[in-house]
């Protein structure tokens, strides 16, 4: 068990990354970009040191980061006790990505994966990518893991009778939780899962209310107009059932 005095963690955004092809240049570029985008902060916080690949990156860019021995000591002594990250999607990478079809991603654009479906905002849905990332993170750090955000932003329709039918959200959550359970069977020490988010709120990436994540609907539009009345979506009852079964009942 985790000691009661061990409460330090980190929170980061993490997307699984795959090379676009088996061409060595694509594989190497994917490795480098995954280091820069996915591992830099967690390596600092969970290994207690600035990774060598970033030292080289700064040097080649002509950047001098003034890191004192005192700073390095703080990093070494302040290693986080568990891993926390958000997962929404995956992306592919290439040494020639500027010549490939792009899609929207979490705050950035990414190369589109032809094998995956996308949300209305271009985020590519990849439940297997969650299992993949959990295995990667546990193999790298050997620390307990919490998934702190996972969900689907979508346009939800409020029906005349007050109901909101969102089977697409249920499918997204069920498929990701199923893959999380596979990661647990793989031996990954997953301690918790938190979907994003329980109630509709303004999207941080697009600043829209119409991009809804919640299992509770809020009557407000992109311009702040509405009654703010809250209504349960179909996904509310489904997620309630999922929680009560500790993720064992994923039936739609």
Predicted regions and their residues:
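Active-site region of glycoside hydrolase catalytic domains
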Residues: 4, 8-252
């Amino acid at each position: 068990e985790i000691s009661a005095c061990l409460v330090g963690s980190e929170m980061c955004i993490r997307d699984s990354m795959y090379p676009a092809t088996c061409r060595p240049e694509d594989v190497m570029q994917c490795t480098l970009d995954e280091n820069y985008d996915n591992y830099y902060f967690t390596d600092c916080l969970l290994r207690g040191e600035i990774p060598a690949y970033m030292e080289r990156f700064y040097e080649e860019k002509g950047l001098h980061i003034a890191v004192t021995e005192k700073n390095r000591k703080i990093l070494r002594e302040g290693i986080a006790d568990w891993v926390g990250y958000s997962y929404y999607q995956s992306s592919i990478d290439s040494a020639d990505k500027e010549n490939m079809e792009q899609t929207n991603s979490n705050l950035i654009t990414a190369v589109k994966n032809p094998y995956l479906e996308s949300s209305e905002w271009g985020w590519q849905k990849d439940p297997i990518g969650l299992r993949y990332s959990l295995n990667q993170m546990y193999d790298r750090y050997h620390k307990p893991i919490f998934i702190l955000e996972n969900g689907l932003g979508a346009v939800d329709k409020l029906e005349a009778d007050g109901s909101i039918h969102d089977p697409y959200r249920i499918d997204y959550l069920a498929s990701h939780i199923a893959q999380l359970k596979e990661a647990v069977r793989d031996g990954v020490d997953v301690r918790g899962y938190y979907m994003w988010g329980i109630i509709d709120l303004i999207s941080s990436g697009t600043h829209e209310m119409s991009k809804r994540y919640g299992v509770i609907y809020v009557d407000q539009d992109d311009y702040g107009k509405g009654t703010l009345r809250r209504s349960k979506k179909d996904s509310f009852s489904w997620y309630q059932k999922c929680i009560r079964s500790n993720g064992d009942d994923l039936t739609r």
